[in-house]
């Protein structure tokens, strides 16, 4: 339920996400997503190459927490065929994940995907594995899985504005992107209230969203 909620919040924020839903099973609700690297067209299966940032940075899976978001930005600049659009999307995702307490955006939670089979052109894949980690695990005090401006905690608005320079985003544009997300706070709080989460988890998530958006104002 928590992943479905955060993914739906991301949809509301205009973030591209993999198709996702909750389905009823014998043991209760189950969360499902659709693979975006395989497409069935008529009688043919289109197979799109999809590489996560761990692979693109030539790192082993166990090193997925090593690195920085600055390094992620360099990977996008190096491999994306639409750098400007993908950099803005990447930036918005990081601000969003900060707001909802998703502190697990490591190198394997970002990927580039082929635009068409064999095209050799890659773009940032839709978002996946978005979770309110800080609400689910309140003992985890880190706000990010990778460093931004050399730190994973005590992130402030100034850190995002500085990071915008790395992404090739002007300060004015960064301010607007942040403002657009902060404006969604009342809707996100309402979504928490109406969600299937336990009340205690709802309260923790709402508190995180309110505190983080205040930091960004």
Language-model segments: which ranges?
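A short beta-strand motif that forms the metal-chelation/ATP-contact edge
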Residues: 30-35, 186-192
